[in-house]
Amino acid sequence: MTTTLINALRDSLASEMALRKSRLESLCVLIVGVLVSRTVNLSHLAGGFPGTAEIASNYRRLQRFFEQVRLDYTALARVIVQLTGLGQGPWLLALDRTNWKLGRRDVNILMLAVLRDGIAVPILWTAMDRAGNSTSDQRSALLSRFCAIFGAASIAGLIADREFVGTAWMTYLAKHDIPFILRIKKDFHVRLADGRHCKIGSLFQKLAKGGRRYLRDDATLGLTAKGQSPAVKLAATRLASGELLVVATNTEPRTALAHYKRRWEIETLFAAVKSRGFNLEDTHLVHPERIAKLLAVLGAITESW
């Protein structure tokens, strides 16, 4: 069965991936090995390869793949869309970050994924070389790569949590006509269309649990001492826990909250590739480029999750 899967996958990838036959076969064997064994631990994968090769030989083969092979991530993004049947969009995208520690090393991944049927499909990612939040430049570079491949018109909306705000970042999204739905903090200052200034929390302080409120008139957020956001509309709800959830958007505010609720799908993705799925933390890979290759393997098998 695994040989049949490997051959079928090789046929699918051959027209898209500019790899020598032996390296394409290594990629396919790796993808099927992860799919069958449900782990990314290289030692375990080496023991699950089809054929009669010794485990030590298979392990060296995996090491050479991660050390030597250069992958075309633009082609891979198209392959993932093709293999998962996503069509041509427009898609709801989620931007998020996941991280873990391997010894003293921090592994930190910035991920852009398409939301689909309860789980996100990873399309592009950046393996960052330091701990902590991403920068505006890193986010912009990731979105620019996506738009170069699929076009900005393929984005129905970009959803992101409170970490992913900022004057430069939101200005980039507005400048490139990317519809966004970004959760914002309640202590942000806002300037309303009538000229009033207040904090987000005080603006919606009377909102009852389960209640919703939409501000359709343009407002601006005072994100830093140096600048304000582009014009946005606001939508808010009070969660059952009593927590206030407010999103800033350049789309229709009445649909923004419904779209934002789907952000959990990228959390499901992270759970699937980490401790509740393929145990991504078990890999001993820490080099950003090698982590990126491993994520490419996981992206190719999203449909199986």
Regions found by a protein language model. Give the residues of each.
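Short, basic interhelical loop/turn and adjoining N-cap
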Residues: 49-61
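Short alpha-helical "recognition helix" segments of helix-turn-helix
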Residues: 45
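Active-site-proximal, Lys/Arg-enriched surface segment
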Residues: 59-119
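Single, function-defining residue in the core of a domain
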Residues: 1-40, 51, 76-78, 87-91, ...
